[in-house]
Amino acid sequence: MNIAVAQFEPKDGDTSYNLSVIEKLTKKAKSKGADLISFHEMAITAYTFTKDLNLKELTELAETVPAGKSTQELIRISKSLDMPILAGLVEKEQGKIFNTYICVTKEGVIAKFRKLHPFINKHLTPGNEYCVFDLLGWKCGILICYDNNVIENVRATALLGAELIFAPHVTGCTPSKMPGRDYVDGTYWENRFKDPVSLRLQFDGPKGRRWLMRWLPARAYDNGVYYAFTNPIGYDGEHLKNGNSMIIDPYGEVLSEIKSFEDDITISKVTKDKIKWSGGWRYKNARRPELYRTILGKEHSSDTTPIWLTSNED
């Protein structure tokens, strides 16, 4: 199977524009032989700007799934190109609002996952279910951004049978207590055509890609799964994001990665033979859950708030 991952610079709240870019990149992926395409977290609506929305504004941005206009448009695009598409949006249902990621085909919505650890807006409700579904002969899972940082989520999704995990993100280039993490100054982006090397050093350094590579390949390797990582490029809200959408195999190797500063895609062929030959597959079979069943099940109060969203830093 040939899978495509995308990156693009979204416009805040402009679902028509964002869907037009999704259609353009899906056409590009189709023309280059991809069997499906995956976009980033809340690609249909944009993400970071929602941190400042009140309940009324967030509710107005949200749509129902599958009846909402954006989902129906995504289905139309998928049907016209005969290609599954995965993308994120803000969903509303029965008075609750979710950070949601969907997979659509010409038949309609075949999978829906709600972010387990939303933090960008206090009015978002966490999802409470994992998602593993069949797509083109593969068992696929979805974990949105921060969900992937909680390693139990990845292991649980793999244990439910996932062979390929879609990992839509809006991440990188934000401050942290970790040395080297910070925002990227906007002048680098403004000068990206005159001085692309300086911007690439910012995006690929500890603020962006180097941070990703500390943990992202390990999620694939430890669990013996493929990872389809997606991330916007350029501005999402007031923050620059480094893109670097990539496909990682069960050995933890990057198969392909987007290195441009443009709206773009990359495609890789994934094969099932690597899964059962991987270390992660063997490690899952070697588990002794009787040793840690009660440890993992202990009561715990979850705190998801990242440092860059806290108002009182030390």
Predicted regions and their residues:
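A short, polar/charged loop-to-alpha-helix boundary motif
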Residues: K115-E129, E262-G280
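Short beta-strand scaffold segments in enzyme catalytic cores
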Residues: A87-L89, T100-C103, C131, S245-I247, ...
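Cysteine/selenocysteine-centered motifs that mediate thiol-based redox chemistry or coordinate metal-sulfur cofactors
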Residues: G141-E163, A167-H169, K274-D314
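Active-site beta-strand/loop signature of hydrolases that rely on acidic residues for catalysis
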Residues: I3, N18, T26-K56, S78, ...
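CN hydrolase (nitrilase-like) catalytic-core segments centered on the catalytic cysteine
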Residues: P66-P84, K139, N149-I265
